[in-house]
């Protein structure tokens, strides 16, 4: 990138590049750099499927849950612990074991541990804190039976959805961990929760993960670069085509005088 007065530029292999529309596909470990590149394209006038600011918001899982919870969307009871001395008190605010312990930097189900007792939870968190990890503590939703739901939001609608089912003996349903997928039709409440969650983060394209509970659907997290292979296979819907159709319309109708969300 070349950051200069009134003339931002992007280069690839020594050649200057520019696009009308960009579709960010950014690995979690590349968030800072990826968001910076998207921001540069936005300053050059490109339309991004998701703004650099919305990508940064969604990748900060704690911030995302704070924003989602603030608009009244249901989610698992969640605690955040910073100091080791506060571990037990935070666990008590979440409830009774078992607890789900999550690394904020984890992806695809990695960095997620189920602890069956208070002692096991404390030990797991203390171990993670030794490497200065940021940790979320969530209630375990036993009635979900190792299943969750992925909804793809594009614009103001859900264009595809699927159910993910964990392999035997595993509580995480991620496909990368051996889970299987099947087509699933969302309820109106699930659709509303998914769309609201994407919108409050400023995302136009998002994968929203939900879990079914005795008190209704709960939002687990929102992904700004959702994988498409599994959901396209399960639903039979060409999600990539839906995204391109949406962006073509947005490109033709957008107001370029509107302030950029950076």
Predicted feature locations:
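Glycine/Thr-rich phosphate-binding loops of Rossmann-like dinucleotide-binding domains
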Residues: 32, 109, 216
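Protein kinase-like catalytic core scaffold
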Residues: 99, 159-160, 206, 218-220
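A long amphipathic alpha-helix within ATP-dependent nucleotide-binding catalytic cores
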Residues: 131, 170-219, 241-242, 246-261
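Active-site nucleotide/adenylate-binding loops and adjacent lid/helix of ATP-dependent enzymes
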Residues: 9-11, 15-17, 42-45, 49, ...
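ATP-binding N-terminal substructure of ATP-dependent carboxylate-amine bond-forming enzymes
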Residues: 1-49
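Short, conserved loop/turn and helix-capping segments at secondary-structure boundaries
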Residues: 115, 233-238
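Phosphate-binding site of ATP-dependent enzymes
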Residues: 112-201
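Glycine-rich phosphate/pyrophosphate-binding beta-alpha loops
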Residues: 28, 223-235
């Amino acid at each position: 990138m070349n950051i200069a007065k009134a003339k931002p530029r992007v280069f690839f292999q020594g050649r200057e590049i520019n696009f009308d529309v960009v579709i960010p596909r950014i690995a979690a470990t590349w968030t800072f750099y990826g968001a910076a590149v998207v921001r540069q394209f936005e300053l050059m006038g490109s339309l991004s499927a998701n703004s650099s600011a919305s990508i940064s918001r969604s990748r900060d899982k704690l911030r995302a849950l704070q924003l989602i919870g603030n608009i009244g969307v249901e989610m698992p009871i969640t605690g955040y612990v910073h100091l080791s001395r506060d571990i037990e008190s935070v666990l008590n605010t979440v409830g009774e074991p078992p607890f789900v312990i999550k690394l904020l930097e984890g992806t695809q189900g990695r960095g997620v541990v189920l602890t069956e007792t208070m002692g096991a939870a404390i030990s797991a968190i203390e171990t993670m804190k030794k490497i200065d990890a940021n940790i979320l503590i969530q209630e375990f939703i036993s009635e979900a039976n190792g299943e969750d739901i992925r909804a793809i939001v594009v614009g103001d609608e859900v264009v595809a959805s699927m159910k993910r089912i964990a392999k035997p003996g595993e509580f995480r349903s991620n496909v990368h961990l051996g889970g299987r997928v099947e087509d699933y039709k969302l309820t109106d409440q699930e659709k509303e929760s998914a769309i609201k969650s994407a919108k409050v983060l400023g995302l136009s394209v998002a994968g929203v993960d939900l879990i079914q509970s005795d008190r209704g659907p709960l939002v687990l997290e929102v992904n700004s670069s959702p994988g498409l292979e599994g959901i396209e296979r399960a639903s039979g819907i060409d999600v990539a085509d839906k995204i391109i159709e949406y962006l073509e319309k947005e490109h033709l109708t957008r107001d370029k005088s509107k302030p950029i969300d950076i």
